[in-house]
């Protein structure tokens, strides 16, 4: 009898332990804040090392004090790097090709991990410049040698050609350099994929692929995504994408094959759609959009994170049509969007775009502080 009691007791505590671990796992919510090249320009570029590091200290302190646990740091915005690279020149934290005097990425990572904060390295894979100014590209930049080749496209900005195998190799090598040398927790690509609808039509015509032009473009992006995912898997680093929340735009204009990414197990670990809508947006409501994204996930191992538009707080939203004043008339939208997102089956967390709109008082609207206070109520 005593043996039975002991066995039952052991079984009870084992079950309790398993359930406790499971509860901790599912209750962990990633709460991210985007720190973009704009913040890096402001707080690091042209600053001495001590001032620069103190500014980073303040960024991490602010994020931690708001009960956030993920920094999404833009490490490559314009074919550059905020860390010493053998592939890309320094950029965002300094003039292109000029060292800031220390390893900014390593400093961010060490400080984040010291404060129990995750760090995802955020990359723009194809963008070189957001203008057509080729003169701004230094000879240190890998794009420089390709300016007169098919590997670079100039079309309302300067971009790497997604159809090029050399470009795919460049992007993959850049990711490998990060995950091999830095203790990042994740790699995140954003929504810059094909720069225009017909930028590489000649390459398509000369290819031996017997598919439509649209299928060709999807295939070229998918090849790059598979390559990067494979590299991240090898180094046990999560890989995800933060695409435009408009599903039609992704597939038909940007050649972002979200249907395949969310169904297969060879592309991504998480998806973070930029659901920059309110509840009264006339074209797309927040609720409908997050439900659409959840419905696309066929691989249950993929985590759904929702990127939220803190930059709209207190501002008119001209694209919302009849709902253009929603962000002006309300100061609890972010809080309500977080609560609603938590009901999603594959929910893994949320993120806010971007740091300065939350913590830089020179950018505050009349609603900012109240929106933050309301958000705090659901961030215990």
Locate predicted features.
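Substrate-binding cleft of secreted/luminal carbohydrate-active enzymes
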Residues: 265-285, 300-380
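Acidic-and-aromatic substrate-binding clefts and catalytic sites of carbohydrate-active enzymes
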Residues: 41, 49-51, 76-81, 98-99, ...
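Polysaccharide-binding and catalytic clefts of secreted carbohydrate-active enzymes
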Residues: 52, 62, 69, 106, ...
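Active-site-adjacent "subsite" loops/lids of carbohydrate-active enzymes
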Residues: 28-54, 120-121, 126-177, 181, ...
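Aromatic-lined carbohydrate-binding/catalytic grooves of carbohydrate-active enzymes
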Residues: 66-100
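Hydrophobic faces of well-ordered beta-strands that scaffold small-molecule active sites
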Residues: 31-35, 71-73, 119-121, 187-189, ...
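Alpha-helical scaffolding within the catalytic cores
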Residues: 58, 105, 225-226, 245-262, ...
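Catalytic domains of carbohydrate-active enzymes, especially glycoside hydrolases
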Residues: 54-80, 181-186, 266-270, 347-349
């Amino acid at each position: 009898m005593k043996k039975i009691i002991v066995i039952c007791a052991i079984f009870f505590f084992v079950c309790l332990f398993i359930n406790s671990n499971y509860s901790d796992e599912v209750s962990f919510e990633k709460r991210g804040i985007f720190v973009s090249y704009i913040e890096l320009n402001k707080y690091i570029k042209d600053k001495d090392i001590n001032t620069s590091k103190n500014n980073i200290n303040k960024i991490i302190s602010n994020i931690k004090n708001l009960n956030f646990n993920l920094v999404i740091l833009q490490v490559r915005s314009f074919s550059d790097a905020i860390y010493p690279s053998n592939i890309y020149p320094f950029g965002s934290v300094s003039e292109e090709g000029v060292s800031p005097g220390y390893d900014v990425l390593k400093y961010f990572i060490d400080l984040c991990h010291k404060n129990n904060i995750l760090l995802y390295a955020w990359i723009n894979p194809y963008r070189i410049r957001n203008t057509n100014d080729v003169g701004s590209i230094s000879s240190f930049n890998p794009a420089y040698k390709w300016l007169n080749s098919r590997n670079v496209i100039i079309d309302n900005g300067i971009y790497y050609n997604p159809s090029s195998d050399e470009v795919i190799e460049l992007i993959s090598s850049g990711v490998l350099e990060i995950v091999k040398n830095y203790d990042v927790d994740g790699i995140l690509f954003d929504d810059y994929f094909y720069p225009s609808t017909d930028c590489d039509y000649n390459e398509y015509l000369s290819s031996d692929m017997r598919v439509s032009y649209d299928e060709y473009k999807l295939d070229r992006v998918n090849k790059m995504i598979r390559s990067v995912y494979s590299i991240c898997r090898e180094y046990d680093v999560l890989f995800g994408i933060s695409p435009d929340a408009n599903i039609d735009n992704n597939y038909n204009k940007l050649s972002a094959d979200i249907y395949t990414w969310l169904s297969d197990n060879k592309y991504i670990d998480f998806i973070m759609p930029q659901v920059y809508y309110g509840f009264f947006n006339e074209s797309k409501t927040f609720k409908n959009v997050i439900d659409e994204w959840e419905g696309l996930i066929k691989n249950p191992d993929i985590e759904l994170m929702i990127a939220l538009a803190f930059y709209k707080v207190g501002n008119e939203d001209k694209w919302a049509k009849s709902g253009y004043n929603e962000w002006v008339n309300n100061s609890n939208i972010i809080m309500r969007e977080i609560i609603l997102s938590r009901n999603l089956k594959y929910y893994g967390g949320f993120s806010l775009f971007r740091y300065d709109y939350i913590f830089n008082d020179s950018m505050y609207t009349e609603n900012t502080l109240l929106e933050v206070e309301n958000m705090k109520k659901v961030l215990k």
